[in-house]
Each structure stands twice: as structure tokens, then as C-alpha cells.
């Protein structure tokens, strides 16, 4: 596992965007051989999306031959609701880059057959071979996507009941009213994430410090879903300074020295 310790959310977003752009450009995708990118929603990736849009506008990257799969979607929220993840992705990213509509894959939280929708999503991912890079965030309780504590580390795309803590955390997007936050969501599984060629998780703020500590210094534990990254051959965590407050001094020093060349010029 790599840990990239930075100072601010802006630096985290910029580092993540540069990493994605390098991966896409090194892959040199074509129509017949697209780069497959997994994407998250929420507040954490916003700086990364801003930086990706800037790099696209500067001619540094094209998304014409990139295929995307999003991590999750609320169940029962209309697609055009401002807080649906469909709306979020178009508003904050897709509308600003050159990705073709047919290359965008989002879970349908209003599908008449939820189980069939989850199977369809998994099958479509498999049809592309694998996701080359999956970017994600993490919840205060260590959840990745909506894989809440005690999720199976072998799980696939499915419906999940959201914990009260997750709904409270997300209520800030719903006018502070937890009752407006859907109780269920569709989410890729932990196993789906671990199948990706590379997983990059962004961690911001002191409220994520326990989750980061569990990911880096704790044991693999289904109560801290983020700890599954220890099982992945190519995992990278990009974090800001407040999120590192629970790490041991020697742990942080180790990764800071190890990544010194990779965190310059931000």
C-alpha cells in the first residue's frame, strides 16, 4: 500500500487528478481499447474533479476513450433529483469533459428489478475485463462506496441498508433533514473494488482519522471496510494533514520520506 500524505484537500485533489491523467495517457486508450475508470461522489472527490476538468480544458487529457463506472446510487431517488448521484456526476464532472454519453455507467436506483440491475452492472464491468483505476472516498466509519461496517470482503454489487450515521453524515446534502436521506442504496461490492487493477482512496479531514488509522495500521477487519486495501496489490491512499492525526508519528514519517519525490510541485 502507498500512502500519500499531503497538507490540504486542494493538494489531495490535484495529486489524484494528476495520477488519473498519467494512468490514462500512459494507457493510450482507443475506441476498441478504452481505459476503464471507477468514480465516487460526495464532497471528498470534488477537488479532484475540478483539477481533472482544468487539465482537460488545458488539453492534457481526453476522456473520449474512457469508460466510467460509478460506485453507488441511492434507491428510490429520482434520477433528476439534485442529490441523486446521477445528477451529481453530470453537474460536477461529465458535463465539463469530452466523455461520450454511451461510455458513462451509473447504477439505476429506480430499476424495477434491483437484483437484476446489480447483476447487469457486474456483468458489464466483467465485459470490459476489469476496472483499471477505481477512485473512492471513505466514510467516518471506514465504509467505501456504501459497503457499511460488517460488509463481506467478497461482496459484489448489491442493495445495502444505510446506517444511521451514514444518513446523518449525508443529511447535509438534504437540507440537514436525515428523514430526506434514502434508507437504501445500490453499491459496488468490496470484491468488485478489489478486482480493480488499482484502487485510489482519498481521505480528508479529522473526522476520517480513525478510518485512516484502521486502513494503514489496523488489521484487516470487516468492521473497517477500508482495511480491505491491505489485500490489494496496488492500493494508494491520498490524505490531507488533519486525517493523519491518529497515525503513529513513525508511520507518517515513513510514508512522508518514502513519497518525498512524488509529492513535490503541488
UniProtKB/Swiss-Prot annotation:
Give residue numbers for the site Part of the allosteric site.
Answer: 151, 158, 160-161, 254
Q: Give the EC number.
A: 3.5.99.6
Q: Mind telling me which GO cellular component terms the entry cites?
A: cytoplasm
Q: What class of enzyme is it?
A: hydrolase
Which UniProt key words apply to this protein? Allosteric enzyme, Carbohydrate metabolism, Hydrolase
Q: Does the keyword Lyase apply?
A: no
Keyword Hydrolase assigned to the entry: answer is yes
Query: What does it catalyze?
Result: alpha-D-glucosamine 6-phosphate + H2O = beta-D-fructose 6-phosphate + NH4(+)
Q: Name one GO biological process term.
A: glucosamine catabolic process
Family assignment?
Belongs to the glucosamine/galactosamine-6-phosphate isomerase family. NagB subfamily.
Q: What is this protein called?
A: Glucosamine-6-phosphate deaminase
Amino acid at each position: 500500500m502507498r500512502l500519500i500524505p499531503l497538507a490540504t484537500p486542494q493538494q489531495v485533489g490535484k495529486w489524484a487528478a494528476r495520477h488519473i491523467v498519467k494512468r490514462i495517457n500512459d494507457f493510450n486508450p482507443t475506441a476498441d481499447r478504452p481505459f476503464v475508470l471507477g468514480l465516487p461522489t460526495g464532497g471528498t472527490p470534488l477537488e479532484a474533479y475540478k483539477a481533472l476538468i482544468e487539465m482537460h480544458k488545458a488539453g492534457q487529457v481526453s476522456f473520449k476513450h474512457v469508460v466510467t463506472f460509478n460506485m453507488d446510487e441511492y434507491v428510490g431517488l429520482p434520477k433528476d433529483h439534485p442529490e441523486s448521484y446521477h445528477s451529481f456526476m453530470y453537474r460536477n464532472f461529465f458535463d465539463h469533459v469530452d466523455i461520450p454519453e454511451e461510455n458513462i455507467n451509473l447504477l439505476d436506483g429506480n430499476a424495477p428489478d434491483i437484483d437484476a440491475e446489480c447483476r447487469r452492472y457486474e456483468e458489464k464491468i466483467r465485459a470490459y475485463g476489469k476496472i483499471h483505476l477505481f477512485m473512492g472516498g471513505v466514510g467516518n466509519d471506514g465504509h467505501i462506496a456504501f459497503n457499511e461496517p460488517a460488509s463481506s470482503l467478497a461482496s459484489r454489487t448489491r442493495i445495502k441498508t444505510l446506517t444511521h450515521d451514514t444518513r446523518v453524515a449525508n443529511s447535509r446534502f438534504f437540507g440537514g433533514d436525515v428523514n430526506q436521506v434514502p434508507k437504501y442504496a445500490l453499491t459496488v461490492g468490496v470484491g468488485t473494488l478489489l478486482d480493480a487493477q488499482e484502487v485510489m482512496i482519498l481521505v480528508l479531514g479529522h473526522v476520517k482519522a480513525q478510518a485512516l488509522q484502521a486502513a494503514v495500521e489496523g488489521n484487516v477487519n470487516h468492521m473497517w471496510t477500508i482495511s480491505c486495501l491491505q489485500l490489494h496489490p496496488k492500493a494508494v491512499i491520498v490524505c490531507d494533514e488533519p486525517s493523519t492525526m491518529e497515525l503513529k508519528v513513525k508511520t507518517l514519517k515513513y510514508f512522508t520520506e518514502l513519497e518525498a519525490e512524488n509529492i513535490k510541485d503541488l
